[in-house]
Amino acid sequence: MPVARPQAAGPDRISLFLVAFLLGSPAAAQAEDGGPEGEMHPSTAYLLPSASLESSLEEGVTSAAPGLLPSQEALEAMEESLPPALPDEASVQHTPALRKGLPSLKQLNSARRQLRPLATPTTLQRLGSPASATTKLREPEDPEQPTAPAPLQIAPFTALATTLPHSPQPAQAPDDSSPGSPLDKGDNELTGSASEESQETTTSTIVTTTIITTEQAPALCGVSFSDPEGYIDSSDFPPQPYSSFLECTYNVTVYTGYGVELQVKSVNLSEGELLSIRGVDGPTLTVLANQTLLVEGQVIRSPTNTISVYFRTFQDDGLGTFQLHYQAFMLSCPFPRRPDAGEVTVMDLHSGGVAHFHCHLGYELQGAKTLTCINASKPHWSSQEPVCSAPCGGAVHNATIGRVLSPSFPGTANGSQLCVWTIEAPEGQKLHLHLERLLLHEKDRMIVYSGRTNTSALLYDSLRTESVPFEGLLSEGSSIRIEFTSDQGQAASAFNIRFEAFEKGHCYEPYIQNGNFTTSDPTYNIGTIVEFTCDPGHSLEQGPAVIECVNVRDPYWNDTEPLCRAMCGGELSAVAGVVLSPNWPEPYAEGEDCVWKIHVGEEKRIFLDIQFLNLSNSDILTIYDGDEVVPHVLGQYFGHSSPQKLYSSTPDLTIQFHSDPAGLIFGKGQGFIMNYIEVSRNDSCSDLPEIQNGWKTTSHTELVRGARITYQCDPGYDIVGSDTLTCQWDLSWSSDPPFCEKIMYCTDPGEVEHSTRLISDPVLLVGTTIQYTCSPGFVLEGSSLLTCYSRETGTPIWTSRLPHCVSEESLACDNPGLPENGYQILYKRLYLPGESLTFMCYEGFELMGEVTIRCILGQPSHWSGPLPICKVNQDSFEHALEAEAAAESSLEGGNMALAIFIPVLLISLLLGGAYIYVTRCRQYSSLRLPLMYSHPYSQITVETEFDNPIYETGETREYEVSI
């Protein structure tokens, strides 16, 4: 049934106005305050929250009481007078909303904060794209991928909707492809929802708002740098407007052969932000550091000429900031791997550098002998490093000295292997083989022939002879053939045979492993005597210490060379010595039981330094303090152990070693190396040695506990290790003595104000160059290029002092002024160093001095010469004098002529004038010339005088005659 129309200022309209105002719709508020009759402006609409806003919001929204709602006819009239909120009103259908209470102010403010609109540049770029016009709710695609929170958005416009009682329909979403919709221009889709509460309510006011959940796409930004030095500052590249989801990639690429060094100047990131520094090697990205490891001052170097900085943030309240300084540095190839049984010599690791490889005697190089460092985004060697391998057979011509070694690789797939070596000495010489090591498997065989074929005389056959001929083998001629046969899949045999050629009529050169010898004749002729000695820790066995070359017809040594083997126990009384495991450097045998007793001076004690210790877990090494095996044990070791240092309290020390007889089952270790030296027995530490290229100072005369020794290096050397050592309570030093290493780098010369610099190597090694360039408006004073070079004495230094960049005006030369009777070409007030100034003289003057002077750089700058002088030209001066003299002569003649002519002319003019005057005016003239004396007829009156014509005439004539 129809209801009464409410008043314009009814409570329901006030509530609607309040809700619209709180939700931020000025249009709705304006519509509510439209006029006295409550008429709505055609362009206005109500904005009220719908039931689909939030569950909490739904509970706080109720429709007005039926008694306060407009009538059916009034609502239909209002509906016809209002424009639709959307162009296609028919596509949006509404149902009556549930009757809920209006939300409180706190709830609305909370809802507004949660539904804050967030726009992204990606969305803005899609304006006008129908495909992107509508953004729907969607499930997250990948939980592992970081996604931005999906904010709810409120559409900027809503409409007051009515629903007739005979047409209730469920809420529907508008068609995405609806033509002409404003959504096609980039706005978000509007949806509405309502539900019918009761059939008794015929008409109700629908509270509608649109809620859109948008999953934002990130705002992408990419910046590339190619300068050799610069800064990456996040504040220089702010995010696009309305964007809180940002992904930025900063790429720095420098010249090929150079890398990029990043130094962290500052980093201030918010929680959840990601900052990653990556090395770029083609398509491969390698993380060098991330935000968890970045601290101020940290330096990261790229392995190639490109480095990438990736920054990602989800923050909408404020973005993190960071600043990185980058500069180019010269890349180098990695140090090439040294081949086993070989050596490598590297000339330079930078581009163009060369590495040379060679193998020890008996090994052959597999691969290139020389590698070159190739200039690339990541410098690399021209090929793989070669390897040194012992060949299976081979031929040696013109042999002198060499080795035959057991092959490095197994044979065929079935395990069989046949190796043949042919050794030929120069004509007239013979060969001697010394079998330093010969360990053959029971199924392996070695045969040695005195000749090039297997039909030659037999010298040795391992199947026929059980003992090894350690004295060696001599050829009958100039060649030897060695055959080695193995049936093992993995080569178990090991041998090392040394050969040498020698002249007939002489003895061969003797050889002793782990020892040395002296000879009376280096040519080993008849009668030569050789004396052998062993290295420390070894003793002579199986031969005399002295042998002699005998037999003139066929010279040979009167006895075999002895062997030097590591002793299994013994008594040592030297002030210093070495204790080695039995059979060192070969592995010790199983079942060994050795005891060494060391005795030094009575007032001394023993310092034992265990340098290497590698035993099996079933073998035991025990060290006792004293000359008896007593319970006072200094140390007991088994297995592998780090280096140890021990002191005895007496001048005696006992070392006991026991190897397990079942070593073949449980395995054996490699052995041990120990050095000992006698030290002072009093309460002081042993004296420490001097160091090369340095010196030491001692805090006390006696090296008692607490005494310190300080080491220092000569100029040009850096100390490596602790420079100060302290005598500890156990009379041992706190650390090993240091050593001095030659300094191969320069100290940083520093920055130059108003300039930039380019460093070839940030480590500043010898050869590093620094190029300084002044900023515009400044001039470099000094050398622009500094090079670090090494000196024989002293530390490396730079080739010149640090330059300075001074302003052009402060270095300019002032204009020196104009020379008298001269002028300048291209006049200026200031002249920069290097500029020149040219002077010229006026005609008739000659320039004395430099025509052109140059501004010389200095403090202050000055001209290269003084101001020139313009003097009168001598020839011009003489011509001027002659002209002046001629002018004066002509002037004097003219003056004399004028002096004569002018008076004559004046007299003539006077006479002529007088004559003209007299002749023309004598009849009526009353003028008489005055006379110097009184006239005899002065008593005659004037009238009488001039009235007598005869008298006048006579007097006139008489006057003329008198004149």
UniProtKB/Swiss-Prot annotation:
TM segment ranges: 898-918
Comp. bias (Low complexity): 47-59, 191-204
Record carries keyword Endoplasmic reticulum: yes
GO cellular component, one term: endoplasmic reticulum
Cytoplasmic face residues: 919-963
Matching InterPro entries: CUB_dom, SEZ6_CSMD_C4BPB_Regulators, Sperma_CUB_dom_sf, Sushi/SCR/CCP_sf, Sushi_SCR_CCP_dom
Residues carrying covalently attached carbohydrate according to the record: N251, N268, N290, N375, N398, N414, N454, N516, N558, N614, N682
Family, as annotated: Belongs to the SEZ6 family.
Name of the protein in question: Seizure 6-like protein
Species: Mus musculus
